[in-house]
UniProtKB/Swiss-Prot annotation:
Gene3D superfamilies in UniProt: 3.30.420.40
Protein's UniProt name: Type III pantothenate kinase
SUPFAM superfamilies per record: Actin-like ATPase domain
Organism: Phocaeicola vulgatus (strain ATCC 8482 / DSM 1447 / JCM 5826 / CCUG 4940 / NBRC 14291 / NCTC 11154) (Bacteroides vulgatus)
Function: Catalyzes the phosphorylation of pantothenate (Pan), the first step in CoA biosynthesis.
Length: 242
């Protein structure tokens, strides 16, 4: 069995895979992986991989050192089963790389746009030949709500929950619709633009806010909350065969 660890800006996700199948997912602090001893006792783990968008804490490094098996710390030097065309691979978020690896593995031979709606929203494109072309980063939903409140004098902090009209008729609904509809139109714009050159484009939607948009977008969307974890497992399996 494989141990997959994805440390994000907000939380850490730990997953167990058995022969390519996702068995269980755990969520916890991104500063300490206290559930590791429990996972090691519960599952016959043989190998692992970790990807992090933040600097690993000393606590986590010590916890990883005590694991009874080898664990790969994913970096731009780790072999991956796609061609990475990013000009500064050392600055590329490993979660973004893992997501396109998963998309290419799940839908081989297809042009794919991966939208990851988390702390930030990332748009990453991998073509049918498995070449990753790069992508863009924009503010995530919570970041947008927070920015409107912090960087203005009178705009209130608004919850994402509530009415989302096409045109806000109060400051609260104007902010909520501005953020959520704005993200919806942003996503649709990227999809429409890519479809001009890649008419058979497929779209994967993942991240903490993915299910806010999977039914709003008109294109065929594959919503997969665990896309990054699947990509990390694919990378681990690929390296195990080298």
């Amino acid at each position: 069995m494989n141990l997959i660890i994805d440390i994000g800006n907000s939380v850490a996700k730990l997953a167990i895979f058995d022969k390519g199948e996702l068995v269980e997912v755990f969520r916890g602090s991104n500063h300490s992986l206290d559930c590791l001893p429990m996972l090691c006792s519960r599952y016959p783990l043989k190998r692992g991989i970790i990807a992090s968008v933040i600097t690993l804490s000393n606590t986590i490094r010590h916890q990883l050192e005590r694991l009874p098996f080898n664990i790969i710390e994913l970096s731009h030097e780790t072999p991956v089963p796609v061609t990475n065309l990013y000009k500064t691979p050392q600055t590329l978020g490993m979660d973004r790389l893992a997501a396109v690896v998963a998309a290419n593995w799940l839908k081989p031979g297809h042009d794919v746009l991966v939208i990851d709606a988390g702390t930030c929203v990332t748009y990453d494109f991998i073509d049918a030949d498995g070449a990753y072309h790069g992508g863009n980063i924009s503010p995530g939903m919570r970041m947008r709500f927070k920015a409107l409140n912090i960087f203005t004098d009178k705009l209130p902090k608004v919850s994402a929950k509530g009415e989302v009209p096409m045109y806000g008729q109060s400051t609260e609904t104007a902010i909520r619709a501005g953020v959520i509809r704005g993200m919806e139109f942003e996503m649709s714009g990227y999809i429409t633009h890519l479809q001009k050159n890649y008419p058979e484009l497929l779209v994967f939607l993942t991240g903490g806010d993915e299910f806010s948009f999977d039914t709003k977008l008109k294109s065929i969307i594959f919503a997969d909350r665990f896309l990054v974890l699947k990509g990390l497992n694919r990378i681990l399996s690929y390296n195990d065969k080298l």
